[in-house]
UniProtKB/Swiss-Prot annotation:
Compositionally biased residues, Low complexity: 300-318
Residue list for modification N-acetylalanine: 2
Signal peptide: none
Protein's organism: Rattus norvegicus
Source organism phylogeny: Eukaryota, Metazoa, Chordata, Craniata, Vertebrata
Domain of life: Eukaryota
Modified sites of kind Phosphoserine: 301, 309
Coiled coil spans: none
Protein name: Adenylyl cyclase-associated protein 2
Length: 477
């Protein structure tokens, strides 16, 4: 009897287990069974490798950013969110076949929104003391767009990494002798992109590798992967398509159908019988059979002239910003100045810096001695200063004139069209570093006047058997 009871218990256990397995097999795609399988870690090797990158390199960067706190930490959290969005996309890629190109663009939208959020954060915090940190991230986060690059996504990531080093070098220059936490931050951030290049080389060498089995990816099939985390209940399935519209009935509280709308639905309900109302057109009224009608030319239907709304001109005009000339902590902010030639900063200290942004047709004079000056996104702007102990930088600008009254060790010119440097006798030993710029001239004093020397824009590189030798290509007489 005991053996019989034990056998019955084992049979009941087996039946219940089979029922559970059967219900799991019949679950619709995106159901709880799929989420449970994901929570058990059944993922493709490429996704596992990407998880390792997030859990090691991105986590290390996030830890170092939390040490610096403030805007850097907030920015790093956004970066972590962008990598999580890319991880969800790669998971979908490993389980689905490649869809049409327009569908791929829709599926990439969560990642592109994360990238845009990171770049917008930098633009909204230009006055931040950690602006170089934010710029390093903002200028390189587009590397996550490698998933849309073929056949060589790896070099694309390297190109974005190079864009970051322009700003990380600034961070290293400012903190390498004073605060090593920033040095660790730079190393951990750049390590992310070098590891991502290695990941791409191993798993997606010539472009994104989609699954060759499974359903074709779509917004419906991938919704649960892109928007739900492992272990969470999936979103409900989309509602069924709506049925035919209800008939218009004269009920209390409902809008009365207009006669024209009722007539329209009455005609639609005729079906093919609607063509019975068409009358026959005789040959003398057909243009292609009647030369006299052709001679009259085409009859053009009257077109309605569209008057622009009063708000259209406002929406197209660029947004005006209030001009700024103020001291924030140790930073002088000079922003959005237009047609001002009387700007002066006279009360300066050695530890102060000046940041000049989006000034047009203006001139600024800085008296005394400051640490550094940055001219960013300015046009037809003149700068006169006494002494700078660090560096003067000009970036993303056009038609800039700088006059040095005292001394400056380094002047950097990047992505600028037109920059004239008037040096004093005490500043003749300064270093001038330029990149991606044109129409640069240095004017040195000679008696009571200046002599102009152009900075080379064209270079010649040769191989001498052991190394590359680069020198200016002198083509001027």
């Amino acid at each position: 009897m005991a053996d019989m009871l034990g056998l019955m218990q084992r049979l009941e256990f087996a039946v219940s287990r089979l029922e559970r397995l059967s219900s799991g097999l019949h679950e619709p795609p995106g159901g709880c069974g799929e989420v449970n399988s994901l929570s058990r870690g059944i993922v493709a090797p490429s996704v596992e490798a990407f998880d390792k990158l997030i859990n090691s390199m991105v986590a290390e960067f996030l830890k170092n950013s939390r040490v610096l706190a403030g805007d850097v930490e907030t920015h790093a959290e956004m970066v972590h969110g962008a990598f999580q969005a890319q991880r969800a996309f790669l998971l979908m890629v490993s389980q689905h076949q490649q869809p049409q190109e327009n569908e791929v663009a829709v599926l990439l939208k969560p990642i592109s929104e994360k990238i845009q959020e990171i770049q917008t954060f930098r633009e909204r915090n230009r006055g931040s003391d950690m602006f170089n940190h934010l710029s390093a991230v903002s200028e390189s986060i587009a590397a996550l767009g490698w998933i849309a690059v073929s056949p060589k996504p790896g070099p694309y990531v390297k190109e974005m990494n190079d864009a970051a080093t322009f700003y990380t070098n600034r961070v290293l220059r400012d903190y390498k002798h004073s605060d090593l936490r920033h040095v660790d931050w730079v190393r951990s951030y750049l390590k992310i992109w070098s590891e991502l290049q290695a990941y791409i080389k191993e798993h997606h060498t010539t472009g994104l590798t989609w699954s060759k089995t499974g359903p074709v990816a779509s917004t419906a099939s991938a919704f649960s992967i892109l928007s739900s985390g492992p272990g969470l209940p999936p979103p409900p399935p989309p509602p069924p398509p709506p049925g035919p519209p209800p008939p218009f009935e004269n009920e209390g509280g409902k809008e009365e159908p207009s006669p024209s709308r009722s007539a329209l639905f009455a005609q639609l309900n005729q079906g093919e019988a609607i063509t019975k109302g068409l009358r026959h057109v005789t040959d003398d009224k057909k243009i292609y059979k009647n030369p006299s009608l052709r001679a009259q030319g085409q009859i053009r239907s009257p077109t309605k002239t569209r008057t622009p709304s009063p708000t259209s001109s406002k929406s197209n005009s660029p947004q005006k910003h209030a001009p700024v000339l103020e001291l924030e902590g140790k930073k002088w902010r000079v922003e959005y100045q237009e047609d001002r030639n009387d700007l002066v900063i006279s009360e300066t200290e050695l530890k102060q810096v000046a940041y000049i942004f989006k000034c047009d047709k203006s001139t600024l004079q800085i008296k005394g001695k400051v640490n550094s000056i940055t001219v960013d996104n300015c046009k037809k702007f003149g700068l006169v200063f006494d002494h700078v102990v660090g560096i003067v930088e000009v970036i993303n600008s056009k038609d800039i004139q700088i006059q040095v009254m005292g001394r400056v060790p380094t002047i950097s010119i990047n992505k600028t069209e037109g920059c004239h440097l008037y040096l004093s006798k005490d500043a003749l030993d300064c270093e001038i570093v330029s990149a991606k710029s044109s129409e640069m001239n240095v004017l040195v004093p000679q008696g009571d006047d200046y002599r102009e020397f152009p900075i080379p824009e064209q270079f010649k590189t040769i191989w001498d058997g052991s190394k590359l030798i680069t020198e200016p290509a002198e083509i001027m007489a």
